[in-house]
Amino acid sequence: MMKRLSSSDSVGGLISLCPTTSTDEQSPRRYGGREFQSMLEGYEEEEEAIVEERGHVGLSEKKRRLSINQVKALEKNFELENKLEPERKVKLAQELGLQPRQVAVWFQNRRARWKTKQLEKDYGVLKTQYDSLRHNFDSLRRDNESLLQEISKLKTKLNGGGGEEEEEENNAAVTTESDISVKEEEVSLPEKITEAPSSPPQFLEHSDGLNYRSFTDLRDLLPLKAAASSFAAAAGSSDSSDSSALLNEESSSNVTVAAPVTVPGGNFFQFVKMEQTEDHEDFLSGEEACEFFSDEQPPSLHWYSTVDHWN
């Protein structure tokens, strides 16, 4: 009996304790409703975070599932063609034992890496070209600056010594022009004034009186007063001696030859042949002969203008 009572007492005690615990758990008012709800919400959020972490780990584990052989096969297919078509995607997935989505993602990532590598290569090539062009540009600019400095120096030299050179050139030009003008005058004077005749004028050797033609030729020889004056200034003494010698020879002989009469220019000589007979000794006196060959006055031969008198 005692055992039964003890057992009943223990069971009763347990029964009495159980509802109390259940009532404590079921009565949230004892700890406050708001605090309990906040605790529950925090617990749920922690569980969701743990699930998400486990999901990420599972994805990473799925990514790591590609073997080395699968990667090599995908690389070969990528080298053949980097674009993936749907039929090809399914075929590769079946051959490699992967999902089509995994194959598509791998190709997408591989294309991105390939583009970045290509951009890096292109950037390196362009950078080298830019550096070379920059170097060439700098060298050309330095050369240009040096050439400009040389040009400025040459300009200063030309401007500094240009006056003396111009003066020398002007003086040389003036001297050459003067020499040319003098030569032209020397050449033009003999051509305009006198020309050397091919043969002396023809005179009548045998005649009883003075030859009219000799006087006309003599008149033509001295047409200009200026020529006579210049001739007198140049050779006055020589002509006077020639005229005196001519008069002396006339008195000694019947046939006389006059001294050469020179005209300015030095290239023309005219000989006048005169013949005088005894009947005309008084016709030409000494004064008239001197006046005829005089250098101071031009000849005035008005007395032989009538043709009938001499004929």
From Swiss-Prot:
Chain spans, region Leucine-zipper: 119-154
Gene Ontology biological process terms from the UniProt entry = abscisic acid-activated signaling pathway; negative regulation of abscisic acid-activated signaling pathway; positive regulation of DNA-templated transcription; response to water deprivation
GO CC terms of this entry: nucleus
Q: Which organism is it from?
A: Arabidopsis thaliana (Mouse-ear cress)
Q: Where is the composition biased (Polar residues)?
A: 1-10
Extract the SMART domains matched here.
HOX
Q: Where is this region: Disordered?
A: 1-32, 157-183
> Where does the record place the site Interaction with ABI1?
67
Kindly report the protein's main subcellular placement as a broad class.
nucleus
- From which lineage does this chain's organism come? Eukaryota, Viridiplantae, Streptophyta, Embryophyta, Tracheophyta
Name the family the entry cites.
Belongs to the HD-ZIP homeobox family. Class I subfamily.
Induction context: By water deficit, by abscisic acid (ABA) and by salt stress. Self expression regulation.
Q: Where is this region: Interaction with ABI1?
A: 1-43, 218-311
Coiled coil regions, renumbered to chain:
none
Identify the domain of life: Eukaryota
Protein encoded by which gene: ATHB-6
- Substitution effect: residue 67 to A: Reduced interaction with ABI1
DNA-binding region (UniProt annotation): 59-118
The record's keywords, sorted A to Z, are:
Abscisic acid signaling pathway, DNA-binding, Homeobox, Nucleus, Stress response, Transcription, Transcription regulation
Q: Where are the transmembrane segments?
A: none
SUPFAM superfamilies per the UniProt record, alphabetical: Homeodomain-like
PROSITE patterns recorded: HOMEOBOX_1, HOMEOBOX_2
Listed name of the protein? Homeobox-leucine zipper protein ATHB-6
